[in-house]
């Protein structure tokens, strides 16, 4: 029976532990035998994803700070009650400062925590963009992913920084929270006209979801034929009878 193998197949090895140099009987290290922990192996498994490197690690730490600050504020808003935290989680929010604080650093309980969270989250996203860009250049790949991510970052910065800057206060920014940011979006839509009738909004959503589905279809198809060599798509794309050509024919026939 053939094994399913491709360049993305992760390999996990679990050999017998090496105990090192023989120690005198009675030594404490003799009793401390090494063990294998599956979860720790997944965390450090280089075959499951690329190594994070310095930029990736810095980005993860900054994101963790932002995540913890949001979580702590959510907990504080329900008097540190874990049951209420879980029950009310969709309604909890970390709000930006009120308009009267303009652009100054507001007191912690009046929007200061939101400003600090926004700083950590923004720096995390910018450092991660730098990580994606650098990895692509180091591997000799195109920087398409970095610039696609940059377009999403532009939307994030527009709503959370550029627009509030032009309007003169942090109160115009998006709050952190599930229903809170949806309520903000609904209010924004009512303020500037219904977004659902905006043709540019329609086109952006259509291209966003359409491109996501097309990329998923392509990636899934190539993975499905990778055991036949279809992952070598660049080399096979112009040849007849190859796995990549059969994959292309499948969708060509499907689309009519």
UniProtKB/Swiss-Prot annotation:
Protein's cellular compartments: Cellular chromatophore membrane
Transmembrane segments: 52-78, 110-139, 142-167, 197-225
Binding annotation for Fe cation: 218, 233
Binding site for (7R,8Z)-bacteriochlorophyll b: 181, 201
SUPFAM superfamilies for this protein: Bacterial photosystem II reaction centre, L and M subunits (SSF81483)
Any one biological process term the GO annotation gives: photosynthetic electron transport in photosystem II
Molecular function per GO: bacteriochlorophyll binding; electron transporter, transferring electrons within the cyclic electron transport pathway of photosynthesis activity; metal ion binding
Topology within the bilayer: Multi-pass membrane protein
Keyword Lipoprotein: no
Residues that bind a ubiquinone: 251
Keywords: Bacteriochlorophyll, Chlorophyll, Chromophore, Electron transport, Iron, Magnesium, Membrane, Metal-binding, Photosynthesis, Reaction center, Transmembrane, Transmembrane helix, Transport
NCBIfam families membership: pufM
Function: The reaction center is a membrane-bound complex that mediates the initial photochemical event in the electron transfer process of photosynthesis.
Subunit structure: Reaction center is composed of four bacteriochlorophylls, two bacteriopheophytins, two ubiquinones, one iron, and two highly hydrophobic polypeptide chains (designated L and M).
Homology family: Belongs to the reaction center PufL/M/PsbA/D family.
Protein name (record): Reaction center protein M chain
Annotated organism of origin: Pararhodospirillum photometricum (Rhodospirillum photometricum)
Gene: pufM
């Amino acid at each position: 029976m053939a094994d399913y193998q491709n360049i993305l197949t992760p390999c996990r090895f679990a050999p017998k532990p090496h105990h090192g140099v023989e120690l005198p009987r009675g030594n404490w290290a003799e009793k401390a035998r090494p063990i294998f922990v599956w979860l720790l192996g997944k965390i450090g498994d280089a075959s499951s994803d690329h190594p994070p490197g310095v930029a990736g690690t810095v980005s993860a730490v900054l994101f963790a700070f932002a995540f913890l600050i949001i979580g702590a504020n959510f907990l504080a808003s329900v008097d540190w009650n874990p049951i209420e935290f879980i029950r009310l989680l969709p309604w909890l929010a970390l709000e930006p400062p009120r308009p009267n604080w303009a652009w100054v650093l507001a007191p912690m309980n009046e929007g200061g925590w939101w400003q600090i969270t926004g700083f950590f989250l923004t720096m995390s996203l910018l450092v991660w963009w730098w990580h994606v860009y650098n990895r692509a250049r180091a591997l000799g790949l195109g920087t398409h992913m970095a610039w696609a991510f940059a377009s999403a970052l532009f939307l994030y910065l527009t709503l959370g920084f550029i627009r509030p800057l032009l309007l003169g206060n942090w109160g115009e920014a998006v709050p952190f929270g599930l229903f809170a940011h949806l309520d903000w979006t609904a209010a924004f839509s009512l303020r500037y006209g219904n977004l659902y009738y905006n043709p540019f909004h329609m086109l952006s959503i259509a291209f966003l979801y359409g491109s996501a589905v097309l990329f998923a279809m392509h990636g899934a198809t190539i993975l499905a034929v990778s055991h036949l060599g279809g992952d070598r798509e660049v080399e096979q794309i112009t040849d007849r009878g190859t796995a990549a050509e059969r994959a292309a024919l499948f969708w060509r026939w499907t689309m009519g």
